[in-house]
Amino acid sequence: MDTIESYQAVIKQVINEYAKLRPSHGNIHLEPIFDDENSRYALMQFGWDRERRVRGNLIYVSIKNNKVFIEYDGIENGITQDLVQKGIPERDIVLAFLPEFQAVGGQ
């Protein structure tokens, strides 16, 4: 398995673990979305909480130039350590949602 395939497998495993969790209130569903062809991965939430519609992403990750770009991380403790613990080196993880990484990857 090459680096990209390995990273894809780890990202999907981590997102699937979070997708099994259930929010403590409301009728909210979590749905993983995987696009291996373009190396994009997301965990979406949708449903209702106290007559208010809930929708949006909790996690959005992409792989570019052999690096894992965490584009959005709405998980309380973050997913970085989960990715590292499952084998992705810290040096290959970019916290793309931070201003200092705006120019990384040309995005």
Indicate where each model-derived feature is located.
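Terminal domain-initiation and capping elements
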Residues: 1-107
